[in-house]
């Protein structure tokens, strides 16, 4: 299975507490025979503070300089088995949240991978419920929501629509 993940950073934990979590999941998926592509924007000086000097063997890392390069990676993700937009990328979050949904097809599942549910849900519930194109309106369109904790309260909060949590 080919997985394309749009996240904050796999190679730098600088201002990025999710890096080690991403590494563990990506490595485990790779060891099970899956191909991993991790797309990350060059933000917050993360590339200058990499703690993985070399890209890891378990993922292709693609660092993007701005939205134009992220758009190219979105095009390249077409046809992947799973495309996931991770929470807290740090730039172009709303644009990515919308754009990955355009890749959804019978062959491509699209997920939202929430690595900071309290923050994500607080922001979503602060949005007007009927305003189009907000993250809150996008939630039901994802095939699934991936979480690493929170239990029933977080699951029920995400049941805004029909996404599988």
Which ranges hold each PLM region?
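Nucleotide-activated donor-dependent transferases that construct or modify glycoconjugates
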Residues: 1-15
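Extended catalytic core of nucleotide-activated donor transferases of GT-like folds
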Residues: 7, 23-27, 32, 37-161
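Short amphipathic alpha-helical segment that frequently serves as the phosphate-/nucleotide-binding helix
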Residues: 16-23
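Conserved small/polar residues in nucleotide/adenosyl-binding loops
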Residues: 163-165
């Amino acid at each position: 299975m080919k997985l394309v993940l749009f996240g904050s950073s796999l190679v730098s934990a600088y201002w990025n507490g999710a890096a080690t979590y991403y590494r563990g999941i990506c490595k485990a998926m790779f060891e099970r025979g899956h191909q991993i592509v991790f797309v990350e924007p060059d933000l917050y000086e993360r590339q200058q503070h990499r703690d993985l000097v070399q890209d890891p063997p378990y993922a292709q890392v693609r660092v993007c300089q701005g939205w134009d390069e992220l758009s190219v990676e979105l095009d390249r993700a077409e046809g992947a088995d799973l495309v996931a937009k991770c929470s807290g990328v740090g730039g172009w979050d709303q644009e990515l949240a919308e754009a990955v949904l355009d890749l959804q097809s019978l062959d491509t599942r699209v997920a939202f991978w929430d690595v900071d549910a309290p923050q994500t849900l607080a922001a979503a519930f602060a949005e007007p419920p009927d305003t189009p194109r907000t993250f809150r309106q996008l939630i039901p369109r994802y095939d699934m929501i991936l979480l690493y904790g929170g239990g029933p309260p977080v699951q029920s909060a995400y049941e805004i629509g029909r996404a599988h949590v």
